[in-house]
Design a protein with these regions (language model features):
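Extracytoplasmic gate region of multi-pass secondary transporters
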Residues: 31, 229-279, 372-376
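Extracellular/periplasmic helix-loop-helix junction of adjacent transmembrane segments
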Residues: 34-67
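Helix-to-loop junctions at the C-terminal end of transmembrane segments
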Residues: 69-80, 283-295
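Cytoplasmic membrane-interface "Motif A"-like loop-to-helix N-cap segments
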Residues: 78-89, 292-303
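C-terminal ends and interior cores of transmembrane alpha-helices
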Residues: 90-109, 304-319
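Glycine-rich segments within core transmembrane alpha-helices of 12-TM secondary carriers
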Residues: 149-173, 196, 363-375
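Multi-pass alpha-helical transporter architecture, strongest
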Residues: 200-205, 398-424
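C-terminal transmembrane helical hairpin of 12-TM major facilitator-type secondary transporters
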Residues: 297-342
Length: 430
């Protein structure tokens, strides 16, 4: 018979993971339908210019992530994790639904891309606090010796949400004529996001608040920037490799496979979906292993693999054969899966409990907003400028070098004392 503590822990996991799934489904589908959105909202004759414009709006959504991280991190440290998570999923659901209703440039003129940009900024504000708040939420409530696994579940929730978006995109691309998909079919996944958001909102709205028993700060962002800025910079450096590698591998490559290799949209999305599915077992396995062998060895291994393998993997990807394209992306998946699954636990463990949401959100989102959000745009621009389809690999190599140095500055935390909420520990003791 399950104990009351075990049931509560399971509900906490569901709230953290499932809400994250819903949030990242909403945010990911924009990247997957970037080509269609570019044609609807930007009146350029050149398809490359349309794609650059669509990814430019994508980047703006990311550039506001630090602001969203500061806002939602403040809510999490001041009023509790539940309030932060509920706010983020509600904002995402509403903005996603409205994107699905927006008229295109042919109907609304300049107002169409302006409105799209504003809604993407709302999404960026929401995502700025969502992932990091769920990381904190899950790791704080981990049973003893399971913080790595619980942090990996946060990453798995993200992966499953993006997988869901990719699968939905692949399904519509497979069954709809290209003209219908361009005209209106791309809107359906955005409209469906409202239903997913409502489910996530009520799931989080009803979960028990079990924040750590520490003094709530009135201005956590001020304390974070004044007293813990070194930690924020370290967390940002840690996130560089994840930001660049993830968004090259799973956002930019969907369009790259179509433009560089001539692979159809349906096949490009199928490749992405199959690759994303592998992240789930990899994440769980790596999370368990880091609780036994530590965080840093896996992080260092992933950055070294990214530096050495980026160019060869892009060379493999740059073939029209579907099997080779799939194998190339699977290589990136293994690297991202290892790194992304370890990252949540070490970030949360490194941050002081009284400003944990704010510190993790700022460190992670400064990097994801400035670097990750610009990565698809930078990759597309470099390819257009140089004519070299392999050049995005050098972005991954540079990011790997930066994060390798940042990792060395962190102490090993998997056996260090940790101030969490105690829900997971309580479940283990009951």
């Amino acid at each position: 018979m399950e104990t009351r503590g075990a049931v509560q822990t399971r509900r906490l996991i569901a709230a953290g993971v499932i809400g994250n799934v819903l949030e990242w489904y909403d945010f990911a589908i924009y990247g997957y339908f970037a080509a269609q959105i570019g044609r609807q909202f930007f009146p350029h004759a050149d398809p490359v210019a349309q794609l650059l414009s669509a990814f430019g709006v994508f980047a703006l959504g990311y550039l506001v992530r630090p602001v969203g991280g500061a806002l939602i991190g403040h809510i999490g440290d001041r009023w509790g994790r539940r309030a932060a998570l509920t706010f983020s999923v509600a904002a995402m659901a509403i903005s996603t639904f409205l994107i699905g209703l927006l008229p295109g440039y042919a109907t609304a003129g300049l107002a169409a891309p302006v409105a799209l940009t504003l809604l993407r900024m709302v999404q960026g504000l929401s995502v700025g606090g969502e992932y990091t708040s769920s990381m904190v939420f899950l790791v704080e409530h981990a049973p003893p010796g399971r913080r790595g696994l619980m942090g990996a579940l946060a990453h798995c929730g993200t992966s499953f949400g993006i997988l869901l978006g990719s699968a939905v995109g692949a399904g519509f691309a497979a069954v709809m004529p290209a003209a219908a998909l361009d005209a209106w079919g791309w809107r359906i996944p955005f409209l469906l996001g409202l239903l997913l958001g409502i489910a996530g909102y009520f799931l989080r709205r009803n979960v028990l608040e079990t924040a750590p028993a520490v003094e709530r700060r009135r201005a956590p962002i001020v304390e974070t920037l004044h007293d813990h800025w070194r930690i924020v910079l370290g967390l940002a450096g840690l996130a560089v490799f994840y930001a660049v590698n993830f968004y090259v591998s799973f956002i930019y490559l969907v369009s790259w496979l179509q433009t560089a290799d001539g692979i159809s949209p349906a096949h490009a999305l199928e490749i992405n979906s199959l690759s994303m599915a592998l992240l789930l077992p990899v994440g769980i396995a790596v999370g368990l292993l880091t609780d036994r062998f530590g965080r840093k060895p896996f992080l260092l291994l992933a950055t070294l693999a990214g530096f050495v393998c980026a160019v060869p993997l892009f060379w493999v990807l740059h073939h029209s054969a579907l099997l080779l394209a799939q194998l190339g992306q699977l290589g990136f998946v293994l690297i991202v899966g290892i790194y992304g699954s370890v990252q949540p636990a070490i970030m949360v463990e490194a941050a002081p409990p009284q400003v944990r949401c704010t510190a993790v959100a700022l460190g992670f989102n400064i990097c994801l907003g400035v670097i990750g959000g610009l990565t698809p745009l930078a990759a597309a621009w470099l390819v257009a400028r140089t004519g070299d389809e392999i050049v995005p690999a050098f972005l991954i190599m540079g990011a790997a070098a930066v994060s390798f140095v940042a990792i060395l500055s962190f102490r090993e935390t998997y056996r260090a004392p940790f101030s969490g909420a105690g829900a997971g520990a309580a479940a283990a003791r009951t």
